[in-house]
């Protein structure tokens, strides 16, 4: 058995909470948890604790929620914990060098991609968006750069042709905790080997925007199909269509599509066929088949259900924008 480490855990969302749960079941001791301050959530905008805070409180672990680490008090508070190592998973706050240097073994981070391929805020989404065939989690020794630290462990899995960001999130949330516990065992026993990243292979996974999720029908069908999966569950790929009965423009969210290899001379964005198998739309090259859509005020529905109630919106020749 490896040496037990005194761990400070820093994280905020559910993805991080699953890693914390794994640490609590390991031989290591989680002596404190850092998470972002409670935020307003829901219709009532009630202050809500993070998933990480909830797990910490359930296990009687002290919780710290600084707005940042700029003050000497916040830094000293961490130093007083006398931690061996700090584990950071989707914390959401920048850690200055003084914080990175505080634990005896420094700080390690679980990152949701194979570094250095995708550094930054949205690696899961960007890997699908780019058509990558695999992704994974990288555990790295943190430095002051953005996901630039030396790599301690990489665990990989394939990206399937039907995977969305939501499904990959679940897969990585299952992969990461085991990889983290194994990596900590290597660190505790002195077996961990750090590998420098090749900066020339790095890409920046910038945050997603609603504007980016608007479909450009001049793109290739394959790229649009990947965008639909990458932007699910947020911000959701969408297009605009005019309701012929009211002449109002409606925003339609796209949940599921497939590529049809058929080529067409129809203008990009025009509907060339609509039946229970899908709504067939011309793109910059092939045909994209819309299979599941969401109209304003409704839940996502199959195209067959959409056409039963709103066939006039999706007549052949209609131009989507």
Swiss-Prot record:
What residues form the membrane-spanning segments? Answer: none
Positions annotated to bind (6S)-5,6,7,8-tetrahydrofolate:
113-116
What top-level class of enzyme does the UniProt entry assign?
A: transferase
Catalytic activity from the UniProt record: L-methionyl-tRNA(fMet) + (6R)-10-formyltetrahydrofolate = N-formyl-L-methionyl-tRNA(fMet) + (6S)-5,6,7,8-tetrahydrofolate + H(+)
What is the E.C. number? 2.1.2.9
> Is Plastid among this UniProt entry's keywords?
no
Q: Which Pfam families match?
A: Formyl_trans_C, Formyl_trans_N
**What GO CC annotations are associated with the protein?**
cytosol
Show which residues constitute the signal peptide: none
What terms describe the molecular function in GO for this protein?
A: methionyl-tRNA formyltransferase activity
Sorted keywords for this record are: Protein biosynthesis, Transferase
Which protein family is it in? Belongs to the Fmt family.
UniProt function note: Attaches a formyl group to the free amino group of methionyl-tRNA(fMet). The formyl group appears to play a dual role in the initiator identity of N-formylmethionyl-tRNA by promoting its recognition by IF2 and preventing the misappropriation of this tRNA by the elongation apparatus.
Extract the PANTHER family matched here.
METHIONYL-TRNA FORMYLTRANSFERASE, METHIONYL-TRNA FORMYLTRANSFERASE, MITOCHONDRIAL
Tell me the protein's name.
Answer: Methionyl-tRNA formyltransferase
Which species is listed as the source? Vibrio atlanticus (strain LGP32) (Vibrio splendidus (strain Mel32))
Q: Could you tell me the gene encoding this protein?
A: fmt
């Amino acid at each position: 058995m490896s040496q037990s480490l005194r761990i400070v855990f820093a994280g905020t969302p559910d993805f991080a909470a699953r890693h914390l749960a794994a640490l609590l079941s390991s031989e290591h001791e989680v002596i404190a948890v850092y998470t972002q301050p409670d935020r307003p959530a829901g219709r009532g905008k009630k202050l809500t604790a993070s998933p990480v805070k909830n797990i910490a409180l359930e296990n009687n672990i002290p919780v710290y929620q600084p707005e940042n680490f700029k003050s000497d008090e916040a830094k000293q508070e961490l130093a007083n914990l006398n931690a061996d190592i700090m584990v950071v998973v989707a914390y959401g706050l920048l850690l200055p060098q003084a914080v990175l240097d505080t634990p005896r073994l420094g700080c390690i981070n679980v990152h949701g991609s194979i570094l250095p391929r995708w550094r930054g805020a949205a690696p899961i989404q960007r890997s699908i968006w780019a058509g990558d065939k695999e992704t994974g989690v990288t555990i790295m020794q943190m430095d002051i750069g953005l996901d630039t630290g030396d790599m301690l462990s990489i665990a990989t899995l394939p990206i399937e042709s039907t995977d969305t960001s939501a499904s990959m999130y679940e897969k990585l949330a299952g992969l990461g905790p085991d990889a983290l516990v194994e990596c900590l065992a290597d660190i505790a026993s002195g077996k961990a080997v750090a590998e420098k990243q090749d900066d020339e292979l790095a890409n920046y996974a910038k945050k997603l925007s609603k504007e980016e999720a608007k479909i450009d029908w001049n793109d290739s069908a394959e790229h649009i199909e990947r965008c639909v999966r990458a932007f699910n569950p947020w911000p959701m790929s969408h297009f605009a269509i005019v309701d012929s009965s009211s002449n109002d423009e409606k925003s339609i969210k796209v949940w599921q599509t497939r590529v049809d290899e058929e080529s067409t001379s129809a203008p990009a964005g025009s509907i060339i066929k609509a039946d229970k198998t899908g709504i067939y739309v011309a793109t910059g090259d092939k045909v994209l088949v819309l299979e599941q859509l969401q109209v304003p005020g409704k839940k996502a529905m199959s195209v067959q259900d959409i056409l039963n109630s709103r066939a006039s919106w999706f007549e052949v020749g209609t131009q989507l924008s």
